[in-house]
Amino acid sequence: IEVAVLSSAMLLAGCEQVAILALNQVETTSFTVEGATLFMEGEINSKTLKQFEAVIAQNPGITTLVELEVPGSLDDDTMIPLAYRVRELGLTTHLTSTSRIYSGGVDLFLAGVNRTMENGAEIGVHSWSDGSREAKNYPRDALEHEQNRKYVEDMLGDDAFYWFTIYAAPADDIHIMSQDEINTYGLLTK
């Protein structure tokens, strides 16, 4: 029975990896422009940065990125350069009263030079996992933390929010942040 359970778990993990690879082959993010505002919805994947750059090239007057429903990122190797590009462009990030952002969507929100949200918006965070270990299971000075830790530090001025997220909920769950937590970690500039 133990072998069957282990085999099933490995197969399921393999299926998850295949699903992620498949989702990285199609556009999972949509962008809509209204004046100087760019509305974004969907999962961030390997196609998102290229989509974003195309929209910006056609609409150089964009000043604000509004995240609507952004459940996360399938590809941190895309999300982090996308976020640095948002910061480089000096964009404001904004959440409407119906915005729901989680995981990598929250990381992208941090890129705004100004970060604002309306009452009712939802911000959800959790740990990352490399498939075998959760972030909190690595020593604090482990190299595995560095890319995400440094990114948060670059965006917020310190890495306290990074450490909060990896303990807030395991990778397969989500913690919806309270207004006090949002304020404590400086997610909003206004």
Provide a role label for each language-model segment.
Residues 1-4:
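Bacterial N-terminal signal peptides that target proteins for export
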Residues 12-14:
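C-terminal motif of bacterial Sec signal peptides marking the signal peptidase cleavage site
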Residues 16-19:
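Bacterial signal peptide processing site
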Residues 21, 41-63:
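A short, well-ordered alpha-helical element
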Residues 49-56, 79-83, 87, 106, ...:
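Extracytoplasmic/secreted envelope proteins and their assembly/folding machinery
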Residues 61-78, 92-100:
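Short, glycine-/small-residue-enriched flexible loop/hinge segments at domain edges that mediate gating
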Residues 64, 132-190:
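Charged, glycine-interspersed solvent-exposed loop segments at helix/strand-loop junctions
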Residues 87-129:
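Glycine-rich beta-to-alpha active-site loop
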